[in-house]
């Protein structure tokens, strides 16, 4: 790892942030605001993309911004997809303040299939899908900035996560 970090000039802070995000999963199982969730998503997913683009190679600094969006898009998609599974493990990644805005309680999230019948659930999910799509649109701008031979893997990941979101 040390050789890779040195060879590709990977910023140490990215790795520290990544580890911090993993630690969050041990100590935190709720997020109050979208800003809290964004910070978590950045640490567990965007940092991975930011490390990858250092290895892939890119043509403009703007690639970093798009790579951050790539991680947020993928992690939000995971969170939306895994609500029931996460709730079974007493983890609610969706921001509590946003859930409350739609009249959804913690016990509603933990109710399993009953959550699908909650009147606020569909509009809530639609809002979060729109958020994820906003980050997706920004993430796709990364591809032309990557070295040509490195585009295939991120393009495949983005397409796969886009199919999950649909």
Functional labels for PLM-detected ranges:
Residues 1-75, 80, 84-166:
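Catalytic cores of Mg2+-dependent Asp-rich isoprenoid enzymes
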């Amino acid at each position: 790892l040390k050789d890779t970090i040195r060879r590709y000039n990977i910023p140490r802070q990215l790795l520290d942030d990544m580890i911090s995000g993993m630690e969050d999963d041990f100590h935190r199982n709720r997020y109050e605001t979208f800003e809290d969730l964004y910070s978590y998503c950045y640490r567990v997913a965007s940092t991975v993309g930011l490390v990858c683009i250092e290895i892939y190679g890119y043509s403009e600094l703007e690639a970093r911004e798009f790579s951050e969006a790539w991680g947020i898009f993928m992690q939000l998609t995971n969170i939306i997809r895994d609500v029931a599974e996460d709730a079974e493990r007493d983890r609610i990644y969706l921001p509590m303040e946003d859930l409350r805005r739609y009249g959804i309680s913690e016990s509603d999230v933990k109710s399993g299939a009953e959550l699908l019948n909650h009147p606020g659930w569909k509009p809530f999910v639609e809002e979060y899908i729109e958020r994820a799509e906003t980050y997706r649109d920004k993430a796709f701008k990364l591809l032309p900035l990557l070295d040509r031979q490195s585009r295939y893997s991120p393009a495949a990941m983005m397409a796969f996560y886009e199919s999950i979101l649909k």
